[in-house]
Design a protein with these regions (language model features):
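Beta-strand-dominated extracellular/periplasmic modules and repeats
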Residues: 1-160
Length: 160
């Protein structure tokens, strides 16, 4: 499947218009979930959460794997995705990228969820004492990745 070029002023990543049937069932299935909170710990509802990731072989350009999803948090601030565990792209460790959009934010927030603490150029750029905030907690086949938008334990966010 070929990706269509888009204008420079749009947000990426860019995805194909259609995905093959069963496109997300090409690896070990996992659930990624978490809670999004604000400075005082209150849950935020109706936050738009987008993810994008590599396939099980670490490729982002697999036409048989969509590699992305979008969800909104519920009244308790919870989001959920069913996906596969990604492989490690060249020069990186396995990860899932997140984009957060919320009414009142002046810009989108981007972060990355890792499955372990290990050498990675993005993770290594985060101060060591804050790196654990980017590692999901595993609970069976569920990976919990809570996001705090502000405060002492604020999730590290990256410039786009």
């Amino acid at each position: 499947m070929k990706l269509i070029p888009t204008g420079e002023m749009t947000l990426g990543p860019f995805f194909p218009r259609e995905f093959a049937a069963g496109a997300n069932h090409l690896g070990d299935e996992i659930e990624v979930m978490g809670k999004i909170t604000q400075l005082d710990g209150r849950a935020l509802d109706n936050v738009v959460v987008e993810i994008w990731q590599a396939d099980r072989d670490g490729r982002f350009d697999n036409p048989k794997f969509s590699g992305w999803g979008r969800a909104a948090t519920d009244a308790k601030g919870i989001y959920r995705f069913k996906t596969i565990k990604p492989g490690a792209p060249k020069g990186r460790i396995a990860h899932i990228n997140f984009l957060i959009l919320y009414s009142g934010l002046m810009r989108q927030l981007q972060t990355t969820m890792f499955f372990e603490l290990a050498a990675d150029p993005v993770l290594d750029a985060v101060p060591e004492k804050r790196r654990a905030l980017l590692v999901a907690r595993r609970e069976g086949t569920v990976y919990r990745f809570d996001l705090r938008l502000r405060g002492e334990r604020e999730t590290p966010f990256f410039d786009d």
